[in-house]
């Protein structure tokens, strides 16, 4: 089981794009949260966190690289649970 955190500028459809990337990598989202805050420049920033079970072994770097390709993603953090 993995915990994935994605920090990005907020926009419509962001959670759907993140979910699609995870599904394409054979991941099942167990739980997730998405919060929107403002940064120091008053930009809306989304903080998406999900606990994921991958059906097949998945390299953290591959998952991170695919998530970073999403428009306006600033940071991806992956940790084991």
Task: Annotate each PLM feature.
Residues 1-81:
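A conserved regulatory-domain signal marking ACT and ACT-like small-molecule sensing domains
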């Amino acid at each position: 089981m993995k915990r994935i955190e994605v920090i990005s500028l907020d926009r419509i459809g962001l959670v759907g794009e993140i979910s699609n990337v995870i599904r394409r990598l054979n991941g099942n989202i167990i739980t997730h949260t998405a919060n929107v805050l403002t940064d120091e420049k008053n930009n809306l920033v989304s903080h998406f966190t999900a606990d994921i079970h991958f059906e097949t072994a998945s390299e953290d770097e591959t998952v991170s690289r695919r998530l970073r390709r999403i428009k306006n993603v600033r940071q991806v953090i992956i940790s084991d649970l």
